[in-house]
C-alpha cells in the first residue's frame, strides 16, 4: 500500500519540482537586473547581462555586428518578437542616445520583453489553478474550439486526464494552448499520441515550458507520418530550454499539411537542430506574433552616429 501511495504522490506532483525555476523565470530575472543596472548608470554590466540573455535564447554573438549580420534572419526564428526586441535593446545599449534617454527607451524594451516572455492574460491577472484545468476538461467542444490550459502547472496525472479528454472529446479541437504549464519532454511524450490523432488541430502552443531539442526531434519524427497531425499548421516552441529554431524537417512537414500556402520561407542557417536542417519560420504563425516580417531587411550597420 505504501508503494501505491508513493506512486500516486509522484503522479500528482508538479512535472519537475527539482529542476529549479523555469527557463523564462531566469530570463526575466536577467531583464529586471538590466533595468536596475541602467538606473544605476552601469551600462557595461547591462550589456554583459544582455549577452547572457541572448545566448540563453539562442541568439548568439557578443557584439551588435554579430547579432545583426550573422543573425539577420532573426525574424525567421521560433520567437521573432523576442529576437526583434533583443536586437533593439542591444542597439540601445551599444549606440546610446542622450544619457537621460538611454534608461527610458531601454527600460521600455525590457518591460515589453518581460511581458512577452511570461504568462499573461488580458482577462485574468491571477495564476490559474487546478480548478481551471478541471473546468476546462469538463466542457463539450464546439466546432473550431480552442482549449486554453496556459499557466496551469501540469503533473503526470494531469497529462493523463488531458489525454483521456482529447481521446473522447477532442474531435472539434482546433487550437490547444499548453504554454507555461511546466511541460517537460517526458510529459509531452505521454501526450503526443493523443495530440497527433486530433483531426482538426491546426495550432499547438508549447512555449514557455521545459522542452528541449529532444522534444523538437520527437515532433519532427511524428510530422513525417502524414497520418499524424493531419492539418497541423503551426507549433510554437519558443521560450523553452534550448529550442531557438524549428528543425527544417519539422517545418517541411508542416508545409506539406498546408500545400495551399506556397510562400512559407525555408531559410537555411548554420545553427540548425538536425543535420542538414536549418532555422526557418512560417508566415502562418500564431496571430499573437502580430505582423512580424517574413523577410529580413537589409543588414543594419554595427553602430550609428547619434
From Swiss-Prot:
Expression induction: Markedly decreased during differentiation.
Gene3D superfamilies cross-referenced by the UniProt entry: Ribonuclease Inhibitor
Disordered as annotated region, ranges: 1-22
Keyword Signal: no
LRR repeat residue numbers: 173-186, 198-211
Domain of life: Eukaryota
Keywords: Leucine-rich repeat, Repeat
Stretches with biased composition (Low complexity): 12-22
Function: May suppress myogenic differentiation by modulating MYOG expression and Erk1/2 signaling.
PANTHER family: LEUCINE-RICH REPEAT-CONTAINING PROTEIN 75A-LIKE ISOFORM X1, LEUCINE-RICH REPEAT-CONTAINING PROTEIN 75B
Family from the record: Belongs to the LRRC75 family.
Official protein name in the record: Leucine-rich repeat-containing protein 75B
Native species: Mus musculus (Mouse)
Amino acid at each position: 500500500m505504501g508503494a501505491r501511495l508513493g506512486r500516486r504522490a509522484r503522479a500528482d506532483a508538479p512535472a519537475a519540482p527539482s529542476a529549479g525555476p523555469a527557463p523564462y523565470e531566469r530570463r526575466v530575472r536577467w531583464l529586471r537586473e538590466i533595468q536596475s543596472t541602467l538606473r544605476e548608470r552601469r551600462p557595461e554590466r547591462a550589456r554583459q547581462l544582455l549577452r547572457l540573455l541572448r545566448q540563453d535564447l539562442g541568439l548568439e554573438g557578443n557584439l551588435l555586428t554579430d547579432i545583426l549580420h550573422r543573425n539577420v534572419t532573426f525574424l525567421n526564428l521560433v520567437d521573432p518578437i523576442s529576437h526583434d526586441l533583443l536586437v533593439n535593446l542591444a542597439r540601445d545599449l551599444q549606440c546610446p542616445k542622450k544619457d537621460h534617454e538611454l534608461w527610458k527607451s531601454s527600460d521600455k524594451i525590457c518591460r515589453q520583453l518581460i511581458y512577452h516572455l511570461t504568462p499573461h492574460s488580458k482577462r485574468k491577472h491571477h495564476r490559474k489553478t487546478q480548478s481551471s484545468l478541471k473546468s476546462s476538461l469538463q466542457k463539450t467542444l464546439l466546432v473550431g474550439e480552442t482549449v486554453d490550459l496556459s499557466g496551469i502547472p501540469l503533473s503526470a496525472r494531469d497529462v493523463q486526464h488531458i489525454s483521456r479528454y482529447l481521446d473522447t472529446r477532442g474531435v472539434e479541437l482546433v487550437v490547444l494552448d499548453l504554454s507555461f504549464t511546466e511541460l517537460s519532454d517526458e510529459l509531452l511524450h505521454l501526450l503526443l499520441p493523443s495530440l497527433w490523432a486530433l483531426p482538426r488541430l491546426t495550432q499547438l502552443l508549447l512555449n514557455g515550458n521545459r522542452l528541449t531539442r529532444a522534444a523538437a526531434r520527437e515532433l519532427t519524427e511524428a510530422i513525417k507520418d502524414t497520418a499524424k497531425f493531419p492539418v497541423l499548421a503551426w507549433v510554437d516552441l519558443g521560450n523553452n530550454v534550448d529550442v531557438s529554431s524549428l528543425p527544417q524537417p519539422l517545418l517541411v512537414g508542416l508545409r506539406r499539411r498546408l500545400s495551399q500556402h506556397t510562400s512559407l520561407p525555408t531559410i537555411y542557417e548554420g545553427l540548425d537542430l538536425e543535420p542538414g536542417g536549418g532555422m526557418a519560420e512560417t508566415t502562418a504563425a500564431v496571430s499573437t506574433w502580430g505582423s512580424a516580417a517574413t523577410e529580413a531587411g537589409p543588414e543594419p550597420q554595427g553602430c550609428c552616429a547619434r
